Protein backbone atom coordinates (compact mmCIF):
# COMPACT_ATOMS: atom_id res chain seq x y z
CA UNK A 1 0.00 0.00 0.00
CA UNK A 2 1.40 3.38 -0.95
CA UNK A 3 0.89 6.47 1.17
CA UNK A 4 1.59 9.86 -0.31
CA UNK A 5 2.04 12.92 1.87
CA UNK A 6 0.55 16.23 0.88
CA UNK A 7 -0.44 16.33 -2.77
CA UNK A 8 -2.82 13.47 -3.60
CA UNK A 9 -4.97 11.58 -1.08
CA UNK A 10 -3.44 8.18 -0.39
CA UNK A 11 -4.78 5.10 -2.13
CA UNK A 12 -6.14 2.70 0.46
CA UNK A 13 -7.47 0.05 -1.88
CA UNK A 14 -6.20 -3.49 -1.26
CA UNK A 15 -5.62 -6.09 -3.95
CA UNK A 16 -6.63 -9.40 -2.37
CA UNK A 17 -5.53 -11.52 -5.33
CA UNK A 18 -1.95 -11.65 -3.96
CA UNK A 19 -0.39 -12.16 -0.55
CA UNK A 20 -1.39 -13.99 2.63
CA UNK A 21 -5.03 -15.11 2.56
CA UNK A 22 -5.45 -15.16 6.34
CA UNK A 23 -3.95 -11.69 6.73
CA UNK A 24 -6.24 -10.24 4.05
CA UNK A 25 -9.34 -11.79 5.61
CA UNK A 26 -8.52 -10.64 9.14
CA UNK A 27 -7.30 -7.16 8.18
CA UNK A 28 -10.48 -6.61 6.21
CA UNK A 29 -12.77 -8.05 8.89
CA UNK A 30 -11.37 -6.15 11.89
CA UNK A 31 -12.58 -2.64 10.90
CA UNK A 32 -15.96 -4.16 9.97
CA UNK A 33 -16.17 -5.85 13.35
CA UNK A 34 -15.13 -2.71 15.23
CA UNK A 35 -17.63 -0.69 13.19
CA UNK A 36 -20.44 -3.09 14.00
CA UNK A 37 -19.62 -3.14 17.71
CA UNK A 38 -19.62 0.65 17.62
CA UNK A 39 -23.01 0.68 15.94
CA UNK A 40 -24.45 -1.64 18.60
CA UNK A 41 -23.01 0.62 21.28
CA UNK A 42 -24.58 3.74 19.92
CA UNK A 43 -27.91 1.97 19.46
CA UNK A 44 -27.65 1.14 23.15
CA UNK A 45 -26.89 4.79 23.97
CA UNK A 46 -29.94 5.85 21.94
CA UNK A 47 -32.11 3.43 23.88
CA UNK A 48 -30.54 4.47 27.19
CA UNK A 49 -31.11 8.20 26.55
CA UNK A 50 -34.76 7.64 25.64
CA UNK A 51 -35.34 5.18 28.48
CA UNK A 52 -33.91 7.51 31.09
CA UNK A 53 -34.78 11.01 29.89
CA UNK A 54 -38.06 10.68 27.99
CA UNK A 55 -41.34 8.92 28.75
CA UNK A 56 -42.08 5.22 28.75
CA UNK A 57 -44.23 5.73 25.61
CA UNK A 58 -41.21 7.18 23.86
CA UNK A 59 -39.15 4.15 24.85
CA UNK A 60 -41.76 1.83 23.33
CA UNK A 61 -42.03 4.05 20.25
CA UNK A 62 -38.33 3.79 19.45
CA UNK A 63 -38.56 0.03 20.07
CA UNK A 64 -41.55 -0.26 17.74
CA UNK A 65 -39.90 1.48 14.80
CA UNK A 66 -36.71 -0.56 15.27
CA UNK A 67 -37.77 -3.45 12.99
CA UNK A 68 -38.89 -1.04 10.23
CA UNK A 69 -35.55 0.72 10.30
CA UNK A 70 -33.56 -2.52 10.49
CA UNK A 71 -35.49 -3.76 7.50
CA UNK A 72 -34.60 -0.63 5.50
CA UNK A 73 -30.95 -0.76 6.49
CA UNK A 74 -30.89 -4.45 5.55
CA UNK A 75 -32.39 -3.63 2.16
CA UNK A 76 -29.81 -0.94 1.36
CA UNK A 77 -26.93 -3.03 2.61
CA UNK A 78 -28.02 -5.84 0.31
CA UNK A 79 -28.30 -3.50 -2.64
CA UNK A 80 -24.89 -1.95 -1.92
CA UNK A 81 -23.42 -5.43 -1.71
CA UNK A 82 -24.70 -5.99 -5.26
CA UNK A 83 -22.70 -3.02 -6.53
CA UNK A 84 -19.78 -4.11 -4.35
CA UNK A 85 -19.64 -7.61 -5.84
CA UNK A 86 -19.64 -6.29 -9.42
CA UNK A 87 -16.93 -3.76 -8.53
CA UNK A 88 -14.77 -6.31 -6.67
CA UNK A 89 -14.85 -8.73 -9.61
CA UNK A 90 -13.85 -6.08 -12.17
CA UNK A 91 -11.24 -4.75 -9.77
CA UNK A 92 -9.76 -8.25 -9.42
CA UNK A 93 -9.85 -8.59 -13.21
CA UNK A 94 -7.93 -5.28 -13.53
CA UNK A 95 -10.62 -3.61 -15.63
CA UNK A 96 -10.63 -0.05 -14.21
CA UNK A 97 -12.94 1.30 -16.94
CA UNK A 98 -15.63 -1.23 -15.95
CA UNK A 99 -15.15 -0.39 -12.27
CA UNK A 100 -15.67 3.28 -13.14
CA UNK A 101 -18.89 2.56 -15.07
CA UNK A 102 -20.25 0.45 -12.20
CA UNK A 103 -19.43 3.10 -9.58
CA UNK A 104 -21.22 5.87 -11.50
CA UNK A 105 -24.21 3.66 -12.26
CA UNK A 106 -24.44 2.73 -8.56
CA UNK A 107 -24.38 6.39 -7.53
CA UNK A 108 -27.18 7.31 -9.97
CA UNK A 109 -29.20 4.35 -8.69
CA UNK A 110 -28.66 5.55 -5.11
CA UNK A 111 -29.85 9.09 -5.89
CA UNK A 112 -33.00 7.76 -7.59
CA UNK A 113 -33.68 5.49 -4.61
CA UNK A 114 -33.23 8.42 -2.22
CA UNK A 115 -36.13 10.22 -3.89
CA UNK A 116 -38.29 7.08 -4.11
CA UNK A 117 -37.78 5.98 -0.51
CA UNK A 118 -38.27 9.44 0.95
CA UNK A 119 -41.61 9.86 -0.84
CA UNK A 120 -42.82 6.27 -0.32
CA UNK A 121 -41.65 6.17 3.28
CA UNK A 122 -43.46 9.35 4.26
CA UNK A 123 -46.63 8.22 2.47
CA UNK A 124 -46.67 4.74 4.01
CA UNK A 125 -45.92 5.54 7.68
CA UNK A 126 -49.55 5.05 8.89
CA UNK A 127 -49.86 1.75 7.01
CA UNK A 128 -46.54 0.43 8.36
CA UNK A 129 -47.37 1.25 11.97
CA UNK A 130 -50.81 -0.28 11.53
CA UNK A 131 -49.31 -3.50 10.13
CA UNK A 132 -47.14 -3.81 13.21
CA UNK A 133 -50.10 -3.45 15.60
CA UNK A 134 -48.61 -0.35 17.18
CA UNK A 135 -50.48 0.48 20.42
CA UNK A 136 -52.49 3.73 20.26
CA UNK A 137 -50.56 5.46 23.05
CA UNK A 138 -47.29 5.01 21.14
CA UNK A 139 -48.62 6.11 17.71
CA UNK A 140 -47.90 9.87 17.89
CA UNK A 141 -44.30 9.31 19.01
CA UNK A 142 -43.65 6.55 16.46
CA UNK A 143 -45.14 8.65 13.67
CA UNK A 144 -43.00 11.66 14.61
CA UNK A 145 -39.85 9.57 14.71
CA UNK A 146 -40.43 7.91 11.34
CA UNK A 147 -41.44 11.18 9.63
CA UNK A 148 -38.13 12.79 10.55
CA UNK A 149 -36.20 9.62 9.78
CA UNK A 150 -37.62 9.24 6.26
CA UNK A 151 -37.09 12.93 5.51
CA UNK A 152 -33.38 12.41 6.06
CA UNK A 153 -32.93 8.92 4.69
CA UNK A 154 -30.71 10.18 1.83
CA UNK A 155 -27.71 10.26 4.17
CA UNK A 156 -28.15 6.60 5.11
CA UNK A 157 -28.35 5.51 1.47
CA UNK A 158 -25.34 7.47 0.30
CA UNK A 159 -23.22 6.32 3.24
CA UNK A 160 -24.15 2.67 2.65
CA UNK A 161 -23.47 2.73 -1.08
CA UNK A 162 -20.25 4.73 -0.68
CA UNK A 163 -18.95 2.34 1.99
CA UNK A 164 -19.90 -0.63 -0.17
CA UNK A 165 -17.86 0.81 -3.05
CA UNK A 166 -14.80 1.40 -0.85
CA UNK A 167 -15.03 -2.09 0.68
CA UNK A 168 -15.24 -3.69 -2.76
CA UNK A 169 -11.73 -2.45 -3.48
CA UNK A 170 -10.52 -3.75 -0.12
CA UNK A 171 -10.78 -0.53 1.92
CA UNK A 172 -12.81 -1.34 5.01
CA UNK A 173 -10.89 1.15 7.16
CA UNK A 174 -12.25 4.47 6.05
CA UNK A 175 -15.93 3.44 6.24
CA UNK A 176 -15.08 2.48 9.85
CA UNK A 177 -13.59 5.91 10.64
CA UNK A 178 -16.71 7.61 9.27
CA UNK A 179 -18.92 5.34 11.33
CA UNK A 180 -17.03 6.31 14.48
CA UNK A 181 -17.38 10.03 13.68
CA UNK A 182 -21.08 9.48 13.04
CA UNK A 183 -21.58 7.48 16.26
CA UNK A 184 -19.81 10.02 18.45
CA UNK A 185 -21.75 12.87 16.83
CA UNK A 186 -25.04 10.98 17.21
CA UNK A 187 -24.40 10.43 20.91
CA UNK A 188 -23.45 14.07 21.49
CA UNK A 189 -26.51 15.38 19.62
CA UNK A 190 -28.75 12.89 21.46
CA UNK A 191 -27.68 14.26 24.81
CA UNK A 192 -27.92 17.86 23.58
CA UNK A 193 -31.35 17.62 21.89
CA UNK A 194 -33.02 15.35 24.43
CA UNK A 195 -31.56 16.41 27.77
CA UNK A 196 -30.72 20.06 27.08
CA UNK A 197 -33.49 21.08 24.63
CA UNK A 198 -36.12 18.52 25.78
CA UNK A 199 -37.01 17.58 22.19
CA UNK A 200 -38.07 14.03 23.11
CA UNK A 201 -38.31 11.39 20.39
CA UNK A 202 -37.93 14.04 17.68
CA UNK A 203 -34.55 14.93 19.16
CA UNK A 204 -33.38 11.33 18.87
CA UNK A 205 -34.51 11.16 15.24
CA UNK A 206 -32.82 14.45 14.34
CA UNK A 207 -29.59 13.36 16.02
CA UNK A 208 -29.62 10.17 13.94
CA UNK A 209 -30.18 11.78 10.56
CA UNK A 210 -27.72 14.64 11.13
CA UNK A 211 -25.05 12.10 12.08
CA UNK A 212 -25.88 10.02 8.98
CA UNK A 213 -25.74 13.08 6.75
CA UNK A 214 -22.25 13.86 8.04
CA UNK A 215 -21.02 10.33 7.32
CA UNK A 216 -22.52 10.57 3.80
CA UNK A 217 -20.65 13.83 3.15
CA UNK A 218 -17.38 12.26 4.38
CA UNK A 219 -17.80 9.22 2.12
CA UNK A 220 -18.58 11.42 -0.88
CA UNK A 221 -15.57 13.61 -0.14
CA UNK A 222 -13.31 10.55 -0.21
CA UNK A 223 -14.87 9.13 -3.37
CA UNK A 224 -14.52 12.45 -5.19
CA UNK A 225 -10.88 12.93 -4.16
CA UNK A 226 -9.44 9.41 -4.30
CA UNK A 227 -7.02 8.55 -7.08
CA UNK A 228 -8.06 4.89 -7.29
CA UNK A 229 -10.45 3.63 -9.98
CA UNK A 230 -13.54 4.18 -7.79
CA UNK A 231 -13.28 7.97 -8.07
CA UNK A 232 -16.67 9.65 -8.54
CA UNK A 233 -16.84 12.51 -11.06
CA UNK A 234 -20.05 14.46 -11.55
CA UNK A 235 -19.60 14.71 -15.32
CA UNK A 236 -19.50 10.90 -15.55
CA UNK A 237 -22.73 10.27 -13.65
CA UNK A 238 -24.92 8.22 -15.95
CA UNK A 239 -26.50 4.78 -16.07
CA UNK A 240 -24.61 2.04 -17.88
CA UNK A 241 -27.42 -0.46 -18.41
CA UNK A 242 -25.22 -3.56 -18.64
CA UNK A 243 -23.75 -2.69 -15.22
CA UNK A 244 -27.15 -1.86 -13.75
CA UNK A 245 -28.41 -5.32 -14.76
CA UNK A 246 -25.50 -6.95 -12.91
CA UNK A 247 -25.92 -4.79 -9.80
CA UNK A 248 -29.63 -5.63 -9.68
CA UNK A 249 -29.06 -9.33 -10.31
CA UNK A 250 -26.85 -9.64 -7.24
CA UNK A 251 -28.27 -6.75 -5.22
CA UNK A 252 -32.02 -7.34 -5.23
CA UNK A 253 -31.96 -10.93 -3.90
CA UNK A 254 -29.40 -9.88 -1.27
CA UNK A 255 -31.53 -6.84 -0.36
CA UNK A 256 -34.73 -8.90 -0.03
CA UNK A 257 -32.93 -11.53 2.00
CA UNK A 258 -31.50 -9.01 4.47
CA UNK A 259 -34.73 -7.03 4.73
CA UNK A 260 -36.96 -10.05 5.31
CA UNK A 261 -34.53 -11.68 7.73
CA UNK A 262 -34.45 -8.45 9.76
CA UNK A 263 -38.23 -8.42 9.78
CA UNK A 264 -38.86 -12.11 10.44
CA UNK A 265 -37.66 -11.64 14.02
CA UNK A 266 -40.79 -9.57 14.62
CA UNK A 267 -42.86 -12.73 14.20
CA UNK A 268 -40.76 -14.65 16.71
CA UNK A 269 -41.18 -11.73 19.11
CA UNK A 270 -44.96 -12.09 19.01
CA UNK A 271 -44.67 -15.71 20.21
CA UNK A 272 -42.33 -14.67 23.02
CA UNK A 273 -44.76 -11.94 24.12
CA UNK A 274 -47.22 -14.66 25.23
CA UNK A 275 -44.99 -15.45 28.18
CA UNK A 276 -45.37 -12.04 29.79
CA UNK A 277 -43.15 -9.08 30.62
CA UNK A 278 -40.36 -10.91 32.47
CA UNK A 279 -39.85 -13.29 29.60
CA UNK A 280 -39.91 -10.40 27.10
CA UNK A 281 -37.20 -8.62 29.08
CA UNK A 282 -35.15 -11.81 29.31
CA UNK A 283 -35.52 -12.26 25.54
CA UNK A 284 -34.44 -8.64 24.95
CA UNK A 285 -31.30 -9.19 27.04
CA UNK A 286 -30.63 -12.41 25.14
CA UNK A 287 -30.98 -10.67 21.75
CA UNK A 288 -28.45 -7.98 22.74
CA UNK A 289 -25.81 -10.64 23.46
CA UNK A 290 -26.96 -12.62 20.42
CA UNK A 291 -26.21 -9.61 18.18
CA UNK A 292 -22.67 -9.37 19.54
CA UNK A 293 -22.08 -13.12 19.03
CA UNK A 294 -23.06 -12.78 15.39
CA UNK A 295 -20.68 -9.94 14.60
CA UNK A 296 -17.41 -11.86 14.08
CA UNK A 297 -18.96 -14.33 11.61
CA UNK A 298 -20.84 -11.55 9.79
CA UNK A 299 -17.64 -9.53 9.41
CA UNK A 300 -15.77 -12.57 8.11
CA UNK A 301 -18.63 -13.37 5.73
CA UNK A 302 -18.24 -9.88 4.25
CA UNK A 303 -14.48 -10.50 3.98
CA UNK A 304 -15.24 -13.71 2.14
CA UNK A 305 -17.56 -11.84 -0.25
CA UNK A 306 -14.93 -9.27 -1.27
CA UNK A 307 -12.16 -11.90 -1.31
CA UNK A 308 -14.12 -14.30 -3.53
CA UNK A 309 -15.23 -11.42 -5.76
CA UNK A 310 -11.71 -10.14 -6.40
CA UNK A 311 -10.15 -13.57 -6.88
CA UNK A 312 -12.87 -14.86 -9.21
CA UNK A 313 -12.57 -11.61 -11.15
CA UNK A 314 -8.87 -12.39 -11.51
CA UNK A 315 -9.81 -15.92 -12.63
CA UNK A 316 -8.20 -17.63 -9.63
CA UNK A 317 -10.90 -20.06 -8.43
CA UNK A 318 -8.64 -22.25 -6.22
CA UNK A 319 -7.50 -19.20 -4.24
CA UNK A 320 -11.12 -18.08 -3.86
CA UNK A 321 -12.07 -21.52 -2.47
CA UNK A 322 -9.09 -21.57 -0.14
CA UNK A 323 -10.18 -18.16 1.17
CA UNK A 324 -13.65 -19.51 1.93
CA UNK A 325 -12.22 -22.47 3.89
CA UNK A 326 -9.92 -20.16 5.81
CA UNK A 327 -12.74 -17.71 6.62
CA UNK A 328 -14.90 -20.59 7.90
CA UNK A 329 -12.05 -21.88 10.08
CA UNK A 330 -11.38 -18.46 11.61
CA UNK A 331 -15.06 -17.79 12.28
CA UNK A 332 -15.61 -21.20 13.92
CA UNK A 333 -12.58 -20.66 16.15
CA UNK A 334 -13.57 -17.13 17.19
CA UNK A 335 -17.20 -18.14 17.82
CA UNK A 336 -16.15 -21.16 19.89
CA UNK A 337 -13.91 -18.97 22.04
CA UNK A 338 -16.73 -16.43 22.54
CA UNK A 339 -19.20 -19.15 23.51
CA UNK A 340 -17.29 -20.15 26.64
CA UNK A 341 -17.82 -16.92 28.64
CA UNK A 342 -21.42 -16.73 27.41
CA UNK A 343 -22.18 -20.22 28.75
CA UNK A 344 -20.31 -19.62 32.01
CA UNK A 345 -21.50 -16.09 32.78
CA UNK A 346 -25.01 -16.15 31.30
CA UNK A 347 -26.68 -14.96 34.56
CA UNK A 348 -24.25 -12.03 34.97
CA UNK A 349 -24.65 -11.04 31.31
CA UNK A 350 -28.45 -11.00 31.60
CA UNK A 351 -28.30 -9.10 34.89
CA UNK A 352 -26.29 -6.38 33.17
CA UNK A 353 -29.47 -5.47 31.24
CA UNK A 354 -32.03 -6.28 33.92
CA UNK A 355 -31.47 -7.35 37.53
CA UNK A 356 -34.91 -8.81 38.27
CA UNK A 357 -34.51 -12.46 39.30
CA UNK A 358 -37.21 -13.86 36.95
CA UNK A 359 -35.77 -11.94 34.01
CA UNK A 360 -32.28 -13.25 34.76
CA UNK A 361 -33.65 -16.81 34.92
CA UNK A 362 -35.27 -16.47 31.47
CA UNK A 363 -32.22 -14.81 29.91
CA UNK A 364 -29.85 -17.41 31.32
CA UNK A 365 -31.99 -20.28 30.06
CA UNK A 366 -32.11 -18.83 26.54
CA UNK A 367 -28.39 -18.06 26.39
CA UNK A 368 -27.30 -21.46 27.64
CA UNK A 369 -29.58 -23.43 25.33
CA UNK A 370 -29.15 -21.41 22.16
CA UNK A 371 -25.50 -20.32 22.14
CA UNK A 372 -23.91 -23.72 21.31
CA UNK A 373 -25.80 -23.55 18.00
CA UNK A 374 -23.95 -20.42 16.88
CA UNK A 375 -21.34 -22.70 15.35
CA UNK A 376 -23.99 -23.72 12.80
CA UNK A 377 -24.50 -20.10 11.83
CA UNK A 378 -20.85 -19.76 10.82
CA UNK A 379 -21.51 -22.30 8.06
CA UNK A 380 -24.46 -20.53 6.48
CA UNK A 381 -23.01 -17.03 6.96
CA UNK A 382 -19.61 -17.75 5.38
CA UNK A 383 -20.90 -19.91 2.51
CA UNK A 384 -23.70 -17.55 1.53
CA UNK A 385 -21.19 -14.67 1.73
CA UNK A 386 -18.91 -16.61 -0.61
CA UNK A 387 -21.71 -17.41 -3.07
CA UNK A 388 -22.74 -13.75 -3.10
CA UNK A 389 -19.14 -12.79 -3.90
CA UNK A 390 -19.38 -15.13 -6.87
CA UNK A 391 -22.42 -13.17 -8.04
CA UNK A 392 -24.92 -15.81 -6.99
CA UNK A 393 -27.24 -14.30 -4.41
CA UNK A 394 -30.48 -15.87 -5.66
CA UNK A 395 -29.95 -19.34 -4.17
CA UNK A 396 -28.71 -18.13 -0.75
CA UNK A 397 -31.77 -15.87 -0.67
CA UNK A 398 -34.16 -18.76 -1.34
CA UNK A 399 -32.40 -20.96 1.25
CA UNK A 400 -32.35 -18.25 3.91
CA UNK A 401 -35.93 -17.16 3.42
CA UNK A 402 -37.03 -20.79 3.31
CA UNK A 403 -35.34 -21.66 6.60
CA UNK A 404 -35.52 -18.36 8.54
CA UNK A 405 -39.01 -17.35 7.54
CA UNK A 406 -41.08 -20.21 6.11
CA UNK A 407 -39.62 -23.12 8.11
CA UNK A 408 -39.35 -21.11 11.33
CA UNK A 409 -42.94 -19.83 11.11
CA UNK A 410 -44.31 -23.32 10.45
CA UNK A 411 -42.19 -24.68 13.31
CA UNK A 412 -43.41 -22.01 15.74
CA UNK A 413 -47.02 -22.46 14.68
CA UNK A 414 -47.01 -26.24 15.05
CA UNK A 415 -45.09 -26.08 18.34
CA UNK A 416 -47.33 -23.51 19.97
CA UNK A 417 -50.64 -24.93 18.73
CA UNK A 418 -50.20 -28.69 18.76
CA UNK A 419 -47.28 -29.74 20.88
CA UNK A 420 -46.50 -27.47 23.77
CA UNK A 421 -46.68 -23.82 24.54
CA UNK A 422 -43.60 -23.76 26.75
CA UNK A 423 -40.69 -21.44 26.17
CA UNK A 424 -37.77 -23.71 25.31
CA UNK A 425 -39.28 -25.60 22.36
CA UNK A 426 -40.36 -22.24 20.92
CA UNK A 427 -37.00 -20.61 21.53
CA UNK A 428 -35.41 -23.55 19.70
CA UNK A 429 -37.07 -22.16 16.56
CA UNK A 430 -33.86 -20.20 16.06
CA UNK A 431 -31.40 -23.12 16.11
CA UNK A 432 -33.85 -25.28 14.14
CA UNK A 433 -33.91 -22.64 11.39
CA UNK A 434 -30.11 -22.37 11.46
CA UNK A 435 -29.75 -26.13 11.15
CA UNK A 436 -31.96 -26.29 8.05
CA UNK A 437 -30.21 -23.27 6.56
CA UNK A 438 -26.66 -24.54 7.17
CA UNK A 439 -27.41 -27.99 5.80
CA UNK A 440 -28.99 -26.58 2.63
CA UNK A 441 -26.26 -23.97 2.10
CA UNK A 442 -23.50 -26.52 2.62
CA UNK A 443 -25.06 -28.97 0.15
CA UNK A 444 -25.56 -26.26 -2.44
CA UNK A 445 -22.05 -24.83 -2.02
CA UNK A 446 -20.57 -28.32 -2.47
CA UNK A 447 -22.47 -28.76 -5.74
CA UNK A 448 -22.11 -25.29 -7.22
CA UNK A 449 -18.72 -24.64 -8.76
CA UNK A 450 -17.71 -21.15 -7.62
CA UNK A 451 -15.72 -20.42 -10.75
CA UNK A 452 -18.66 -20.91 -13.12
CA UNK A 453 -20.46 -17.97 -11.61
CA UNK A 454 -18.26 -15.02 -12.56
CA UNK A 455 -19.99 -11.83 -13.64
CA UNK A 456 -16.93 -10.67 -15.59
CA UNK A 457 -17.02 -11.48 -19.27
CA UNK A 458 -13.64 -12.36 -20.77
CA UNK A 459 -12.13 -9.83 -23.15
Predicted regions mapped to residue ranges:
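Small-residue hotspots at the loop-to-helix junctions and early N-terminal turns
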Residues: 54-67, 142-146, 205, 277-292, ...
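Transmembrane alpha-helix boundary and packing residues in multipass membrane permease domains
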Residues: 32, 36, 48, 85, ...
